[in-house]
Regions:
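Transmembrane helix-loop-helix hairpins at membrane boundaries of multipass inner-membrane proteins
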Residues: 1-5, 19-116, 195-206, 211, ...
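Helix-to-loop transition at the C-terminal end of transmembrane segments
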Residues: 53-64, 185-192, 480-485
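Hydrophobic transmembrane alpha-helices and their helix-loop junctions in integral membrane proteins
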Residues: 101-105, 123-135, 148-438, 443
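Central hydrophobic cores of alpha-helical transmembrane segments in multi-pass inner-membrane proteins
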Residues: 7-25, 40-53, 90-104, 121-123, ...
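Cytoplasmic/organellar membrane-interface segments at the starts of transmembrane helices
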Residues: 380-382, 435-516
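Alpha-helical transmembrane segments and their helix-start/interface "positive-inside/aromatic belt" motifs
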Residues: 32-44, 162-174, 380-384, 460-468
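Short phosphate-coordinating micro-motif centered on Lys-Gly-acidic
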Residues: 142
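Hydrophobic alpha-helical membrane-insertion segments
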Residues: 41-55, 171-183, 393, 429, ...
Length: 516
């Protein structure tokens, strides 16, 4: 089983989608229930089989493990593998998807197609995190747009068509430059093998282009091409504007997948490609990325403060939290990258839970306007408690996973740039401001609005969906070494290779390159 384990985990959802497409018949309630149960079964099996990856994984071995490789088309290879960085994203994906399906039990329109879309999306997301061939990675990375485009465009809100096309075009245009860069890399190296490309040293000699001096040469241009794609995916300021629209229009399950998993592809891309393949380009562009990140943290936190739509507020909160991730990654030290990966994992649980919370009251009241609520704690005490827990985790309360990621990230950046660190720390205060403001407006006070007097608290199924999310948020908050021990050796190797590449290039503190 070991040899094909990664392929089995990757393609269980896609094969299940095919079975659902061929076997399921009818559009009545019974057929819809069969589709839901089958999708839940398929995603649960995927999760339990993926646990074998963790069992067989050796954290001390920093090379790729359980590698599967076979010739594919035109000399490109079908190659999968996991290391200490990618294994966490694989597990996050397989962990979240059964909860997403479970939370979609109330969907009534085109249920079979809805479940097929999510099953295909899971396979494509897993492929992104396991692919060890550049072409294979790109295919998974881009193909993932299609199911998400359909999920927003078919099952979304009133402006779903606009939001879905905006999401599609932003991410597609960002990836055009990455595709050009891949062609350049293949032309220079003759391979698309990611392991081989990580050990290849691309030129960092300065050259002129259109009258401009390109410091860092080819590496800087390749870095910028990949950066364009990953910055949109994160998303980073100022290319974040597709995210609030996509979140607001997406169905609840779509928002959960978008926030919990899809955004993490950008951070994963920086860790898998930018730092190891273009270390000199990454170093030269570090200040640029750090300032964009800190602007994102402060600006989107302030924008979140004035939102009237709950989903939009949480969407802007996501952009701010992803700002901490890019700060941690480009701090390029052990604490920074540990914190960035931890933050991405934690954000997956917390933001996913917050979107589920919004979905629960939207299903009852069919509005996300903050002003439409107030005093819900009187009618929905269990809901108020769960919302409070994840609000506090989002703020970074000690004892929750949200604290560990932010703390490590800030420790990492303090060693690199004190001003960036101080400005980023202000984001912690701002996140407390908008999160507690949201909670007070929705939950506290008297139950004045007539429409809320008959609202029902969470059902048993709705409560059950949150149990694993609460468990993971607490477990990683009080016992973070569970994750840090898993990623530590791989992160240390990444940092060591990055620093050795810089020293070989003769880079000194002011980002100039020694002549050679």
């Amino acid at each position: 089983m070991d040899y094909f384990l990664l392929s089995i985990v990757t393609f269980i959802p896609a094969v299940s989608a095919l079975i659902l497409l061929l076997v399921a018949r009818g559009n009545d309630h019974a057929a819809a229930l069969v589709a839901k149960r089958f999708a839940l079964f398929a995603t649960s099996v995927t999760f339990f089989v993926s646990l074998f990856i963790v069992v067989q994984f050796d954290p001390e071995n920093t090379s790729f493990q359980m590698v599967e490789e076979t010739d594919w088309i035109m000399g490109f290879k079908y190659k999968l593998g996991v290391d200490g960085i990618s294994i966490l994203f694989v597990m996050l994906t397989t962990f979240m998807m059964p909860l997403v399906i479970w939370a979609s039990w109330g969907v009534e329109a085109r249920v079979k197609e809805y479940m097929i879309s999510f099953l295909l999306l899971e396979t494509l997301m897993l492929g992104v995190f396991m692919a060890l061939d550049l072409v294979l990675f790109y295919l998974f990375f881009e193909a993932g747009l299609i199911p998400m485009f359909l999920i927003i465009g078919i099952w979304g809100g009133a402006n779903r068509v606009y939001a879905s096309f905006k999401f599609f075009l932003y991410t597609l245009l960002g990836s055009v430059l990455m595709l050009i860069a891949m062609v350049v890399m293949y032309a220079e190296t003759g391979t698309t093998d990611i392991q081989a490309l990580m050990s290849h040293q691309f030129s960092y000699n300065n050259f002129g282009l259109f009258g401009l001096q390109i410091v860092g040469g080819t590496q800087t241009l390749l870095f910028l091409a990949f950066f364009a794609s990953f910055a949109v995916k994160m998303p980073m300021w100022p290319v974040h504007t597709w995210l609030p629209d996509a979140h607001v229009q997406a169905p609840t399950a779509g928002s959960v997948v978008l926030a919990a998993i899809l955004l993490k592809m950008g951070g994963y891309g920086f860790l898998r490609f930018s730092l190891p393949m273009f270390p000199v380009g990454s170093y030269i562009m570090t200040d640029f990325v750090l300032w964009l990140s800190v602007i994102a943290i402060v600006y989107t936190s302030l924008v979140a403060l004035v939102q009237s739509d709950m989903k939009k507020l949480i969407a802007y909160s996501s952009v701010a939290h992803m700002g901490y991730v890019t700060i941690g990654i480009f701090a390029a030290n052990q604490q920074g990258i540990d914190g960035a990966i931890f933050q991405m994992l934690s954000h997956g649980f917390i933001s996913g839970a917050l979107f589920l919370c919004v979905g629960i009251i939207y299903d009852r009241m069919h509005t996300r306007e903050i002003d439409a609520y107030g005093g819900l704690v009187n009618r929905m005490p269990a809901y108020a408690l769960i919302f409070m827990f994840f609000t506090m985790a989002n703020v970074g309360l000690p004892g929750t996973s949200g604290f560990v990621g932010e703390f490590l990230t800030l420790v990492g950046i303090f060693k690199v740039n004190t001003w960036i660190a101080l400005l980023a720390t202000s984001g912690v205060v701002l996140s407390a401001a908008y999160a507690l403001w949201l909670y007070r407006r929705v939950m506290m006070g008297d139950l004045i609005k007539e429409a809320l007097r008959t609202i029902q608290d969470m059902s048993l199924r709705e409560r059950a969906v949150f149990v694993p999310l609460i468990g993971m948020t607490l477990l990683l908050g009080v016992y973070p070494v569970l994750v840090l021990d898993l990623i530590g050796p791989s992160v240390q190797t990444l940092v060591d290779n990055y620093n050795s590449a810089l020293s070989i290039a003769g880079i000194n503190g002011d980002a100039t390159i020694a002549s050679h």
